[in-house]
From Swiss-Prot:
The keyword Zinc applies. Keywords: Metal-binding, Zinc. This is Protein yippee-like PJ691.02. It comes from Schizosaccharomyces pombe (strain 972 / ATCC 24843) (Fission yeast). PROSITE patterns: YIPPEE. GO terms for molecular function: zinc ion binding. Zn(2+) binds at residues 16, 19, 72, 75. Belongs to the yippee family. Residues 12-109 form the Yippee domain. GO terms for cellular component: nucleus; ubiquitin ligase complex. The keyword RNA-binding does not apply. It holds the Pfam family Yippee-Mis18.
Amino acid sequence: MGRYYPVHLKSRCYVCAKCKTHLAFKGHLLSHDYRGKNGPACLFKRVENVIEMEPKTEQMSTGRFIVRHIHCCRCHTYIGWKYVSSYEPSQKFKDGHYILEMQDAVLQRDDPEPDDCFIHPPITFLSSSFS
C-alpha cells in the first residue's frame, strides 16, 4: 500500500487513537462545534493519512450532503467524513472540509514522538471495502 514516512512534528496534532498515525495539524482546525455519528467532532480544512471511500448522499441535521467516509490509512479505523458537496446554499462553506470524530477515533498530542506520526499521500478507493 505504500511506504511510511515518519515526520517529527513540532506543533500539536491529532492522531488516530488506535494506531497513533498523524491525521491533522491543530492549525487546520476550523471548529469544535460539531457532532459526529459517535459524539463530539471537529471540522478541519485538511487532514492527512486517510482513505476516502465512495461518495454518497446523507441526510444530516444541517441538510443533505454528498460525503465520503474516511478511514485511517494505517489501521482502517473509521474516523469521520469529508464534505464533498452540500445541497443547501447556506452550508456550502463545508464543501471540501473534513469531520474527525473525537470520541474514539482521534486524540490530541502535545509532543508526538517521531515514530508515532506518519505522512502518506491521500488514498481514494472507489469501492467501500472497509464498511
